């Protein structure tokens, strides 16, 4: 199982990526974040193998 964290400040983008990824049988979205502050908190509680990261994510 590949564990993924989604990091984007636009909820609609996160939802679209999450909906696409959940169709795969071997991918699990373990967390989501809308800012770098949230990313740090999510990483403490949700392990991941891959992070989908918006490069323009606010602080």
Question: Locations of the language-model features?
Answer:
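Non-catalytic signal-transmission and effector/linker regions of two-component phosphorelay proteins
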Residues: 1-3
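Intrinsically disordered, low-complexity regions enriched in small/polar residues
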Residues: 9-12, 38
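Two-component/phosphorelay signaling modules centered on CheY-like receiver
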Residues: 11-31
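The feature encodes the CheY-like receiver
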Residues: 13, 58-59
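Acidic, metal-coordinating helix/loop segments flanking the phosphotransfer/catalytic sites
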Residues: 32-50
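Active-site residues of response regulator receiver
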Residues: 54-55
């Amino acid at each position: 199982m590949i564990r993924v964290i989604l990091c984007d400040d636009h909820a609609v983008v996160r939802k679209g990526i999450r909906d696409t990824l959940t169709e795969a049988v071997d991918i699990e979205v373990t967390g989501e974040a809308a800012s770098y502050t949230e990313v740090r908190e999510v990483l403490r509680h949700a392990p991941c193998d891959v992070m989908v990261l918006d490069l323009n994510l606010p602080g």
